[in-house]
Amino acid sequence: MALLCSALSNSTHPSFRSHIAGANSENLWHLSAHPAQKSKRRCNLTLSSRAAARISSALESGKLKPWQIPKRDWFPPEFTFGAASAAYQIEGAWNEGGKGPSSWDNFCHNYPERIMDGSNWDVAANSYYMYKEDVRMLKEIGMDSYRFSISWPRILPEGTLEGGINHEGIQYYNDLLDCLIENGIKPYITLFHWDTPQALADKYNDFLDRRIVKDYTDYATVCFEHFGDKVKNWITFNEPHSFCGLAYGTGLHAPGLCSPGMDCAIPQGDALRQPYIVGHNLLLAHAETVDVYKKFYKGDDGQIGMVMDVMAYEPYGNNFVDQQAQERSIDFHIGWFLEPMVRGDYPFSMRSLVGDRLPFFTKSEQEKLVSSYDFVGINYYTARFSEHIDISPEIIPKLNTDDAYSTPEFNDSNGIPIGPDLGMYWILSYPKGLKDILLLMKEKYGNPPIYITENGTADMDGWGNPPMTDPLDDPLRIEYLQQHMTAIKEAIDLGADVRGHFTWSLIDNFEWSMGYLSRFGIVYIDRNDGFKRIMKKSAKWLKEFNGATKEVNNKILGASSCCSGELMWFLVQNPYGK
């Protein structure tokens, strides 16, 4: 097994001991580590070569044989299959129903040039008015669960409890929950999916200030209080790694901050420090919220966790330094937020390389952080190669040089791509990577219960390779889902505790800085025909996979007062309820 300690030793890689790395990083770890962890101090470990080599012929060969195509009965009856979405990406009604403005409202309206197609989410998929159609699609496809997010400024328009609760927003989510439950669909709620109340950005720069911890905890408590009788599965934060890096490092996402001289909406930030400050405050808000939930709202059957965005990593070349770069890529991508919840502090490599720019936890904060999850959510799409880079005075320090590895290449040192190109520029299909990540969670992080909370690929409007002629014909998505479900099954057979899979996404939506150019939905949204929902071939395959027959669905939906045919017709004809 490769040891990170050896990569950071005085004799092996002096480039790591640069001005960026702290001179006494191991002592820093001892000062900050949770007492229960000090007796267990170890270097970070990779998967053993034997474990990494356990690749099935199904994942190696690319296309699955007919007998390798996954089936529902491969998985335990209690294994959940669902689809996912996010409030900002689908709801629309950006200034209706008492909702306050969000950071993304501000970003899209004031910096439209930062969205590739110049669009915004003002209407999005119109789900605020057409949520019953979304539930109908879930039911018809046979999904047993739905992961969606609550818009913080729709609940607290000013971002704070003192600013008042918006009861129209409470009613909207209660109506959605009632509709889901009536149709036998379990809700999984994400409390924060990147749409920070703009009022908090104006008041104190939102997640850059510790006051966010109290305000977020207050917001989460309002949600527990009003929806807790209907919701047993909670997620505090979605993809903190992406949130910190894209919103406060590169500025590609709202609020759009980056360092002076960089190309972003607001080049008045500090890309070397602010992402770590935001991540630290986010972890503190998570810990406080979980503490409140477990003390007052969890009961016997509730559970709460955080969702991590992960990539799989392979060494760029067959050499020691690239293998260590692979280690660091895992630390900086997954360990940044998971290790504080497992052992009470950031990974040793981060303490070493980021130095005093990485905040410290107090003892009481560590005590709340450790074991502050009942499950871990994993969003997995693709993989990269990790290549070591030397840290030297000639390199201009920035967020993506802190980790001393580079992952811009889709190809390895021999020019071999990590997987097939699916048309979406950043997604190359690599199902083996999902299996490897799940086994890594088992061997390195104590095998926590895991839900695959996002997994899917996108169609590209005008960017496809080759371009799509029929938006409903998505064979690459079907193949992608089949291969990744097979990878999950193989990881389960090797002992990984995986409990569910959510396809991203249920419907085509507003895809952040890409606007509407990329379509991740298994259901097509016809924006020229009243936002009509139409199942793609992938949805029809999932319907068959789930064993949902047309006769059963029609019978159930026909009896549903929530999603009756008359209501559906009215909503399609009158999307704004007029």
Curated annotation (Swiss-Prot):
S-S pairs: 258-264
Instruction: Spell out the SUPFAM superfamilies in the cross-references.
Output: (Trans)glycosidases
What is catalysed by this protein? avenacoside B + H2O = 26-desgluco-avenacoside B + D-glucose
Where does this protein reside within or beyond the cell? Plastid, Chloroplast stroma
Q: Which residues form the active site?
A: 239 (proton donor), 454 (nucleophile)
Q: Which Pfam families match?
A: Glyco_hydro_1
**Transit peptide segment:** 1-57
GO MF annotations in UniProt: beta-glucosidase activity
User: What stretches pass through the bilayer?
Assistant: none
Which residues are noted in the entry as a beta-D-glucoside-binding? 89, 193, 238-239, 381, 454, 504, 511-512, 520
Gene3D superfamilies (UniProt xref): Glycosidases
Q: What is its EC number?
A: 3.2.1.188
User: Which UniProt keyword terms apply here?
Assistant: Chloroplast, Disulfide bond, Glycosidase, Hydrolase, Plant defense, Plastid, Transit peptide
InterPro entries in the record, alphabetically?
Glyco_hydro_1, Glyco_hydro_1_N_CS, Glycoside_hydrolase_SF
One GO biological process term: carbohydrate metabolic process
Q: Which GO terms describe its cellular component?
A: chloroplast stroma
Quaternary assembly: Heteromultimer with P60A in a 1:1 stoichiometry. Aggregates to form the fibrillar stromacentre.
Functional note = Beta-glucosidase acting as a preformed defense system. Hydrolyzes the bisdesmosides avenacosides A and B to 26-desgluco-avenacosides exhibiting fungicidal activity. Can use beta-fucoside > beta-glucoside > beta-galactoside > beta-xyloside as substrates, but not alpha-glycosides, beta-thioglucosides and disaccharides.
- Tell me which family the UniProt entry assigns to this protein: Belongs to the glycosyl hydrolase 1 family.
Q: What protein name is recorded for this chain?
A: Avenacosidase 2
